[in-house]
């Protein structure tokens, strides 16, 4: 089972990762092409393109300017420990055991606007470049056109290497749009998380994001291998709903809290 999650806007480069082990991103030559485009943007361009404040635009202009294709523990951090946000709160990577982290290297991938696909221990220099950004580049008008089939090909490689053909999509729509679904050589599973509110079960973004992280953790810590096993997910009050589910879209409900 291979799990795919989104990155996060919030980054933590202040606290050290719990391991010194690292790997290098495999698509970094493509990242370098994007960085060259981004280095040509002024802070005002970035503010407009990304709809961010002048302060965040200035920070990201500085990040683009200082980015280098040489990665080390001095200028980068392992991706799984650098990202912070609702999904990563649920995943709680800092408390994974060394064995679980090793398992994650084969069974977890993070999608990224700048890096394409990241393994948990891949070093990552700080950046902000969301997949939905309409950044014109030498390959097209946005990042979906830039990455083309590269992300799908990398996921197929990882899917083949980890031993079965199940890809669990716990990423957002914005990021999973970068995957060519028809090109995936396996079974795609799209879990859905709904919370009760005013008598109805609804997808509530904040809760759903955290639930995606919780399910990623469940898969890594229990070494889930089948869709049947996935239905046992019960973290934080969620339970499987056979009535609302279809074979490849398992739905998990939670009562109002």
Curated annotation (Swiss-Prot):
Superkingdom? Bacteria
Q: Which GO terms describe its cellular component?
A: cytosol
- Gene Ontology biological process terms in this record: response to hydroperoxide
Give the HAMAP family listed for this entry.
UPF0246 (MF_00652)
Q: Which PANTHER family match?
A: PEROXIDE STRESS RESISTANCE PROTEIN YAAA, PEROXIDE STRESS RESPONSE PROTEIN YAAA
Family to which the UniProt record says this protein belongs: Belongs to the UPF0246 family.
Protein name (Swiss-Prot/TrEMBL): UPF0246 protein Sama_0917
């Amino acid at each position: 089972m291979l799990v795919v999650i989104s990155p996060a806007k919030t980054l933590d480069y202040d606290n050290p990762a719990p391991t010194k082990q690292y790997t290098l991103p495999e698509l970094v030559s493509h990242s370098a092409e994007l960085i060259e485009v981004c280095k040509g943007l002024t802070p005002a361009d970035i503010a407009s393109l990304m709809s961010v404040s002048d302060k965040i635009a200035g920070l990201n202009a500085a990040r683009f300017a200082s980015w280098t294709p040489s990665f080390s523990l001095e200028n980068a951090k392992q991706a799984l420990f650098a990202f912070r946000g609702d999904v990563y709160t649920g995943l709680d990577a800092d408390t994974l055991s060394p064995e679980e982290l090793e398992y994650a290297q084969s069974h977890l991938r993070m999608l990224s606007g700048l890096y394409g696909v990241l393994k948990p221990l891949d070093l990552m220099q700080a950046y902000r470049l969301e997949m939905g950004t309409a950044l014109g580049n030498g390959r097209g008008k946005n990042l979906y056109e830039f990455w083309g089939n590269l992300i799908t090909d990398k996921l197929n490689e990882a899917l083949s290497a980890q031993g079965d053909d199940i890809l669990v999509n716990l990423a957002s729509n914005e990021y999973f749009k970068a995957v060519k679904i028809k090109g995936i050589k396996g079974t795609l599973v799209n879990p859905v998380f709904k919370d009760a509110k005013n008598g109805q079960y609804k997808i509530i973004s904040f809760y759903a994001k955290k639930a995606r992280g919780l399910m990623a953790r469940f898969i890594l810590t229990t070494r889930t291998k089948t869709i049947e096993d996935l239905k046992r997910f019960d973290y934080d009050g969620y339970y499987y709903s056979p009535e609302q589910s279809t074979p490849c879209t398992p739905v998990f409900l939670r009562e109002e809290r």
